[in-house]
Amino acid sequence: MTDEDDKQNYRVEHDSMGEVRVPADAKWRAQTQRAVENFPISGQRLERAHIEALARIKGAAAKVNAELGVLDKDVAEAIQEAAAEVAEGRWDEHFPVDVFQTGSGTSSNMNANEVIATLATERLGRDVHPNDHVNASQSSNDVFPSSIHIAATAAVTRDLVPALEHLAAALGRKSEEFADVVKAGRTHLMDATPVTLGQEFGGYAAQVRYGVERLAASLPRLAELPLGGTAVGTGINTPPGFSAAVIAEVARVTGLPLTEARDHFEAQGARDGIVETSGQLRTIAVGLTKIANDLRWMASGPRTGLSEISLPDLQPGSSIMPGKVNPVIPEAVLMVAAQVTGNDATVAAAGAAGNFELNVMLPVIAKNVLESVRLLAHVSRLLADRTVDGIVAHRDRAREYAESSPSVVTPLNKYIGYEEAAKVAKKALAERQTIRQVVLESGYVDRGDLTLEQLDEALDVLRMTHP
């Protein structure tokens, strides 16, 4: 490559450490380029929602800085316009910094500062500085964690909660549809007293609804922002009123229930609020694991499994066994749940990395929480639309299991006692007879321990599903 070619492909930028060659068409500048060269680790960049949150902060800060006399009006307006474009996703390709970078997220904060400064400079026709103007009254140490909380709050409230409510509604509809489908209950994967399929689906719907409740309970801590605390939580280099004003502006622009941190030192030195949210995401994942596994068990077969329900056939299940169809959506749910559980372990470890006034694993917290929210939101809708809505109950098969379970002997305890009832159950299993047959053959009715009517009432499997 000739010097002339080099000049066409690159330009020279400067920062406090000296000169840096930057791709000629890049909107970023020196500090971003240093980060690109320092962290060629995963190839994973910030989530789109995270870039948007950073840009919303920059736009709001410019507006408030102008109102408080920190920035000239024309500079602030140019920054606001540039930040709006970044928030809309028009410049995502100019955010190349790897997620695995400096633990404060300074590289990504400077990436935002530099891109917005370049765009604002092009608009204004004179220099807009990434630090002096775009980052005015701010520090990476309050901006970056605030951006994580903004992005996560938006993702939880706008994506995940509606998706979970959608799934809960689908499960609730099936609960009503299957209200009279009696089946064998199972504990320890062994036969137990009867339940209805509707009761089971009602339980699944409740699990999902309670997940929404847990998210709602943690939301106030997630929506607290350390913005305005700057370097260490003291608010150094901010004008009076900046913190409250900039958070109010971000809340207005985003429509999110954002509030100023009650204690800026907690809000920058610790990440407990988002660790709590990650724990709620893990709990939801655990619940979805239980639901997905139950669906797989009940649909197992078609000949040698339980076959109490059918799931929709979505795709061929085997490259060698013709006609085989597998429960692909529940399996995808299980993998998402495993990923979310692993993400939470990462977030917990990263959350413990707060030393004195700053947590230094912020980018990896952001990556894992936002990924967990996205995965759970997508897979919840898929589970509802492509599996739950199409489930069909095999009523006769389910009732047959319920009636053949030795545990239906349980209501006879009050007539013949626990020990005699246990003998009946064991004999029924050994001789492959029904409980009713063994009771009659053993003479309990003839001896007057109970009447035939009482026996029939006690062995009504649907009646057993209620107190």
Swiss-Prot record:
Keywords: Cytoplasm, Lyase, Tricarboxylic acid cycle. One of its GO terms (biological process) is fumarate metabolic process. Pathway: Carbohydrate metabolism; tricarboxylic acid cycle; (S)-malate from fumarate: step 1/1. Pfam families: FumaraseC_C (PF10415), Lyase_1 (PF00206). GO terms for molecular function: fumarate hydratase activity. It catalyses: (S)-malate = fumarate + H2O. HAMAP family: FumaraseC. Involved in the TCA cycle. Catalyzes the stereospecific interconversion of fumarate to L-malate. This is Fumarate hydratase class II. The gene is fumC.
